[in-house]
From Swiss-Prot:
Residues noted as binding acetyl-CoA in the record, renumbered to the chain: L101, G102, V103, K109, H110, G111, I112, G113, S114, N143, Y150, E151, N152, R153
Catalytic activity: N-terminal L-methionyl-[transmembrane protein] + acetyl-CoA = N-terminal N(alpha)-acetyl-L-methionyl-[transmembrane protein] + CoA + H(+); L-lysyl-[protein] + acetyl-CoA = N(6)-acetyl-L-lysyl-[protein] + CoA + H(+)
EC class: transferase
Binding site for substrate: Y38, L99, Y165
Alphabetized CDD domains for the sequence: NAT_SF
Post-translational modification: Acetylated: autoacetylation is required for optimal acetyltransferase activity.
Family of the protein in this entry: Belongs to the acetyltransferase family. NAA60 subfamily.
Annotated protein name in UniProt: N-alpha-acetyltransferase 60
Source organism of this protein record: Bos taurus
Mode of membrane association: Peripheral membrane protein
Length: 242
């Protein structure tokens, strides 16, 4: 596509699911976008298997972007990403894995990538509702454009994966990026526990603890010495404004 893309292109973009007839086009696009060679079975799966959410963005009939994702139980997360969610979440908790997200070069920076990502979120809210707690993906450590895209949309780097990719026989490093949704969160670290404890202590009045201890001691003493009259006026006083 050589013609200039108008700034209003997004208003002419339509969304539809990929189908078997799109295989050749999708192969060509993925060859342009990604350095990884996918087997033919992968293209058949993402265009035919209902377990994949495979959405195309089209402009005047041509595919100019697509997203492929799979919503699955947390038990099916690969070992290297097994700690994406805290162990407190049940085994039937779901996650969404983005296998692919790409936009034709001429149509980048027109909001199409964001539209596709938001469409995935809408799909999750409709099908998985609040059972899906995270959206995650893998990216080459050298793919700064993709990294900036996801970081600008609140994805956080979760893991560094050395030698994760094999590209034309050369091993390349990758990152796992995660966006937590619907209350999802990773396992707590020691720092998280310290911060939580600090937050809890910060909500306590610094003088409320000794004041409570004094009151409890006074009550206990009165129960043993009923003849004793202990006046708070002559005792210890604590300011409530400390």
């Amino acid at each position: 596509m050589t013609e200039a893309v108008p700034s209003s292109a997004l208003s002419e973009v339509s969304l539809r699911l990929l189908c078997h007839d799109d295989i050749d086009t999708v192969k060509h696009l993925c060859g342009d976008w990604f350095p990884i060679e996918y087997p033919d079975s992968w293209y058949r799966d993402i265009t035919s298997n209902k377990k994949f959410f495979s959405l195309a963005a089209t402009y005047r009939g041509d595919i100019v972007g697509m997203i492929v994702a799979e919503i699955k139980n947390r038990t099916k997360i690969h070992k290297e990403d097994g700690d994406i969610l805290a162990s407190s979440f049940s085994v039937d908790t779901q996650v969404a894995y983005i296998l692919s997200l790409g936009v034709v070069k001429e149509f980048r920076k027109h909001g199409i990538g964001s539209l596709l990502l938001e469409s995935l979120k809408d799909h999750i809210s409709t099908t998985a509702q609040d059972h899906c707690k995270a959206i995650y993906l893998h990216v080459l450590t050298t793919n700064n454009t993709a990294i900036s895209f996801y970081e600008n949309r609140d994805f956080k780097q979760h893991h560094y994966l050395p030698y994760y990719y094999s590209i034309r026989g050369v091993l390349k490093d990758g990152f796992t990026y995660v966006l937590y949704i619907n209350g999802g969160h990773p396992p707590w670290t020691i720092l998280d526990y310290i911060q939580h404890l600090g937050s809890a202590l910060a909500n306590l009045s610094p003088c409320s603890i000794p004041h409570r201890i004094y009151r409890q001691a006074q009550s206990l003493l009165c129960s043993f010495l009923p003849w004793s009259s202990i006046s708070t006026k002559g005792g210890i006083e604590y300011s409530r404004t400390m």
